[in-house]
Regions:
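Short, Lys/Arg-rich, polar N-terminal cytosolic tail immediately upstream
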Residues: 2-35
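Extended hydrophobic alpha-helices typical of membrane-associated regions
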Residues: 20, 28, 32, 129, ...
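Intramembrane alpha-helical segments
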Residues: 35-36, 105-187, 191
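Small-residue-rich segments of transmembrane alpha-helices in multi-pass membrane proteins
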Residues: 47-53, 165-181, 227-235, 293-310
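Membrane-embedded alpha-helical segments that form the functional core of polytopic membrane enzymes
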Residues: 47-90, 137-148, 188-209
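Acidic (Asp/Glu-rich) catalytic motifs at the cytosolic membrane interface
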Residues: 79-105, 205-227
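C-terminal ends of transmembrane helices
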Residues: 88-97, 101, 146-161, 207, ...
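Multi-pass membrane catalytic core of lipid/isoprenoid biosynthesis enzymes
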Residues: 92, 96-141, 224-258
């Protein structure tokens, strides 16, 4: 039988809004919970960051985009839905969070077979990746392994401060746009490598920000997340320093590549990041979890501005 806390969690998840109520009415049994734990709210963010790599490779010319559209659309779907969605669902299966989590407000209790579902979905994506350029398939396989190491006991590197940070900064920050570039089959250029490396410290900045609003819940569960080990102030300082390192690499890439007069556009996302991080650092001691959560989403908007600026500088 379902205990009272789990029953309350399930009721809130099902009644949160009209879309939830409609989904649970249409989908049989608990099957809509499987979809929710793929966290569709993150799909546009992941798709955009993967597509960034593709557009950096081919440019913004409609003709060049059309040449690689077939492989790009299939590869992005596999990366976003199978790999990233499966990773997040696998994470949910072992975290068993009761409160809000990244990209999923009022999560339903993890269904019984969520872990098996997630692993199967990621494996299906790996088979599909073999139909695409070899570098993409290799990139997918590397992230598949990292996802399992990150989420699944006994290793569960998510709960090991520092290891969780490294996996995410490389997996989302660098390997995701690399996957998009790999879908085109084009050789990597030096400036492109610098851009992809720049996204590594930029995600290093974002990652602890995603943990601050779950600070107390992670502490109660016994996880040693990066934010818990560093503390809030040092987490925010680390985010600020990592952001500055990322933009130093972006500016270096602009100097190496053919950015021309467009390189000053990189100052816009830098200003957006500083507008999020500096007030957060100044006010963190008095902020509530909901305010930390809003800060995380503000940082995600700064990330989106960064992607757009990078495209404007390097792909036009």
């Amino acid at each position: 039988m379902m205990d009272a806390g789990r029953a309350d969690q399930a009721a809130r998840a099902r009644a949160l809004n009209v879309w939830r109520r409609m989904g649970y009415r249409i989908a049989p049994g608990d099957s809509f919970s499987y979809i929710l734990h793929l966290r569709p709210a993150e799909w546009p963010i992941m798709a955009a960051h993967t597509a960034l790599g593709t557009l950096l490779a081919v440019g913004l010319s409609p003709g060049a985009i059309a040449e690689t559209a077939g492989d790009a659309l299939l590869g992005i779907a596999l990366w976003v839905l199978c790999l990233n969605g499966g990773t997040l669902a696998l994470n949910s299966a072992y975290d068993r969070d009761a409160g809000d989590i990244g990209y999923l407000e009022a999560p339903p209790p993890p269904p019984r077979h969520l872990a098996a579902f997630a692993l199967t979905l990621m494996a299906v994506g790996q088979v599909g990746a073999l139909l695409l350029p070899p570098l993409f398939a290799l990139d997918y396989a590397a992230c598949f392994v990292l996802s399992v190491l990150y989420s699944v006991p006994p290793l569960r590197l998510k709960a090991v401060a520092g290891a969780d940070w490294l996996i995410n900064m490389w997996g989302f920050g660098t390997l995701t746009p690399l996957a998009g570039w790999a879908l085109t089959g084009r050789p990597l250029e030096p400036w492109a490598l610098l851009v992809m490396f720049a996204f590594c410290p930029l995600f290093a900045a974002l990652y602890p920000l995603t943990q601050l609003y779950q600070y107390e819940e992670d502490r109660c569960r016994g996880d040693r997340t990066l934010a818990l080990v560093l503390g809030m102030r040092r987490s925010l300082l680390a985010a600020l320093l990592a952001t500055l390192a990322a933009f130093a690499l972006f500016f270096l890439a602009a100097a190496v590549g053919a950015a021309g007069w467009r390189w000053p556009l990189l100052a816009l996302p830098l200003a957006a990041w500083l507008a999020v991080l500096v007030p957060w650092l100044r006010n963190h001691e008095t902020m509530q979890p909901a305010q930390h959560q809003r800060g995380m989403y503000a940082a995600l908007r700064a990330w989106a501005v960064t992607d757009l600026a990078v495209l404007a500088v390097f792909a036009l």
